[in-house]
Amino acid sequence: MKKKGFIIGGICLAAIVGILGYNHEAVRVVFHNVYSPSVKLDDSSKWNGGKAYEKLPYSETSENDYLDLYVPDSEEPMPLIILVHGGGFVYNDSQSRQAQLMYRYFRDHGYACASVNYRLAQEAAFPAGVEDVKSAIRFLRANAEKYGYDPERFAIWGESAGG
């Protein structure tokens, strides 16, 4: 019994030391050097037709609280697909390659698309990024009529930290 307590205590102590010793700047530098895409998709892969709203602010909390919104031409409000980028809360942004591929696919299938940017760990501690995404969704719901998509038909997805 003492052995189990010792092991569990050691694991907890290691976790606490790891959390206290976590260096956001070191992680950002490492990931930035690893994730430096040299290939950008051409403009036709991003959006073609309809309206594009890039770096649309959804909150005044941070200059990083913006989203990119793409709405195809349509007589009727269409569903909105929301992408939340990944990156372990330390890198990436709303204009990632995955977002560009999403725009290409969904524009051809009659969906509006939004890609949400949020504060990363270097700027604000968790759960700031999650709170930012909630703010973005409230903004998108409140402005659905203005931008021409249906506030009752949202889908949200993401990868890694965005999932």
Predicted regions and their residues:
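N-terminal cap/lid segment of alpha/beta-hydrolase-fold proteins
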Residues: V29-E76
